[in-house]
Amino acid sequence: MKNKNPFNIFFPLSLDKIENLEKIKKNCSSIQYAWLSGYFWNLANQTPSRLICEKNEFFRKDNEEKIITIISASQTGNARQLAKRFNKYLKNENKKTNLIDAADYNFKKIKNERFLILIISTQGEGEPPEEALSFYKFIMSKKAPRLENLHYSVFGLGDVSYNLFCQAGKDFDKRFSELGGKSLLHRLDSDIEYESNYIQWSEELLLAINKIDVSTCSVFKKNDKKNFIDKLNYTKYKPAVATVLLNQKITGRNSTKDVHHIELDITNSNIVYTPGDALGVWYQNSSQLIKQILKLLSIRISDKVKVKDKIITIFEALKKNFELTTNTKHIIQKYTDVTQNKFLKKIISDNKKLNNYVKKTPLLKMIYDHPKKLSSQQLISILRPLKPRLYSISSSQSEMNDEVHITVGVVKKQISGTIHLGGSSSYLSQFLKIDDSVKIFVEEKSNFRLPENKDVPIIMIGSGTGIAPFRAFIQQRDNDKATGKNWIFFGNPNFTEDFLYQLEWQKYLKKKLLTKMSLAWSRDQKEKIYVQDKIRENGKELWEWVNQGAQIYVCGNASKMAKDVEKELLDVFSKNGSMDIEESSEFLNNLRITRRYQRDVY
């Protein structure tokens, strides 16, 4: 039995053809060899494009046409938007692509990939986004396959003010290399101002792909540097304008929290959203805060400054273009450079002191403690560009039609007797009035979705404003007349002051749409009770729901509540499912892979 020849461009003849050549070879003289050489060379002496096409034909005969897989792993939507842009960019170069979210990617088949592009953000303490957790755990495990045939590139998105800047991208890049993958292009770690980095990276990466991939016969031509942005109705950089219908405080007067329910009219925007999505809001800085900063730096509000090739007043620039409520190590370092302040020089020379100073010192306080006369251009050179903030949508469009609702917790910090407010949360809760306009866009959260099967039970776990998406969920279940059971765990400090949307939840309980509600009030008694305590208390029943196919949803703080909840879920599975901790962890990971465990954490 003859073995098949591994037919490829480096050895492009089948065994039968080689045998025929051997027969000819036996009966030829040296002169005939020379003539045959010239004859075949003449046939081969064609245009490069023709040769490339013929070469490609060889690949098509024995292999499927190579597809470039583009994976987005996004926390706030930036990675997803860049992945969409890069996908369109490649398609315009006649490349075959497969654009997919990390949550939908079948990572166990990664060994079959030839080209893989990963665009990934980092959350928390250097962790991958929620939708990439399963992929991350798999690729870091002993189960990960060798990737000698893989050509890859990683584009990392992050915030340079964090110690573990772009760590998720770094981890994937290192691991792909350890498994034998070949990097098409050096990994790019990009801060929030990523546009110019992306354009250069995308062009260089296309060139790198073209050196290896000849699956198309088109001649490469340099693209317009603008690249292609998907023509969505509304995006982060092309937001819709909504009108405020209602802005109502929903915590009690004695509450330690200030939470507002905000309703926006989207009648004229044709915006479409789904329960689980987030609403992006472009906020404006407080006029009072701007005036305080300018006064301390001896800058007139009418001074002109250049922003994005436009000349505007410094007041207008600070109002809409720069962050004023967030301090970072880079801002402190830049402010130290322009002021040459001795105290700040000592701070930045010690990383531990610098980290502590960042946590305790807002931008305004730093300037107040160390004022210096600056020019308007010097001021904006140290600031970060303003970013929109994302809020979980707390309404179902099926119920609310031309409205979108959000639940906003005001960020407050008291430092040295002064209250410092969050820029976006204070803008939404305190400055927006009825009929005011606000710029918005929808950030799709495809990995935080209700089950398609309306008979499937769901378990919702949230604390504080983490209840917001579950209000949308229950409205949708009501509209769909879903028959699946619904159980919510909710925690906040006090029953009388902090029971968000109390009357609505009681209504759903009364009509038996809400099957069960487990409440945790941390300050209503001496011993603090949190949602994880309620999970432990109801562990046996929760395990029964899981065995009935229930999907689990968690929304809230990533570093505290969500971690404590996950730890308790692992313990519940271990105790009630007769598993050790490793088996329990594997069980939870399988729930995540099958979309039965979904989180929206921040």
From Swiss-Prot:
Note accompanying the cofactor annotation: Binds 1 FAD per subunit. Binds 1 FMN per subunit.
Binding site for FMN: 74-79, 121-124, 157-166
A GO term for molecular function: flavin adenine dinucleotide binding
Residue ranges occupied by any FAD-binding FR-type domain in the UniProt entry: 237-451
Span of domain Flavodoxin-like: 68-206
Pfam family, any one: Flavodoxin_1
Enzyme Commission code: 1.8.1.2
Enzyme class: oxidoreductase
Keyword Lyase: no
Catalytic activity: hydrogen sulfide + 3 NADP(+) + 3 H2O = sulfite + 3 NADPH + 4 H(+)
Gene3D superfamilies found in the cross-reference section: 3.40.50.360, NADPH-cytochrome p450 Reductase, Chain A, domain 3, Nucleotide-binding domain of ferredoxin-NADP reductase (FNR) module, Translation factors
Sequence positions that bind FAD: 325, 359, 389-392, 407-409, 422-425, 602
Entry keyword annotation includes NADP: yes
Alphabetically ordered keywords of this record: Amino-acid biosynthesis, Cysteine biosynthesis, Electron transport, FAD, Flavoprotein, FMN, NADP, Oxidoreductase, Transport
InterPro entries: CysJ (IPR010199), CysJ-like_FAD-binding (IPR003097), CysJ_Proteobact (IPR029758), FAD-bd_FR_type (IPR017927), Flavdoxin-like (IPR001094), Flavodoxin/NO_synth (IPR008254), Flavoprot_Pyr_Nucl_cyt_Rdtase (IPR001709), Flavoprotein-like_sf (IPR029039)
Cofactor(s) needed for function: FAD; FMN
GO biological process: cysteine biosynthetic process; hydrogen sulfide biosynthetic process; sulfate assimilation
Binding site for NADP(+): 522-523, 528-532, 564
Domain of life (superkingdom): Bacteria
Pathway it works in: Sulfur metabolism; hydrogen sulfide biosynthesis; hydrogen sulfide from sulfite (NADPH route): step 1/1
Family designation: Belongs to the NADPH-dependent sulphite reductase flavoprotein subunit CysJ family.
Cross-referenced PANTHER family: NADPH OXIDOREDUCTASE A (PTHR19384:SF128), NITRIC OXIDE SYNTHASE-RELATED (PTHR19384)
Subunit structure: Alpha(8)-beta(8). The alpha component is a flavoprotein, the beta component is a hemoprotein.
HAMAP family in the cross-refs: CysJ (MF_01541)
Listed name of the protein: Sulfite reductase [NADPH] flavoprotein alpha-component
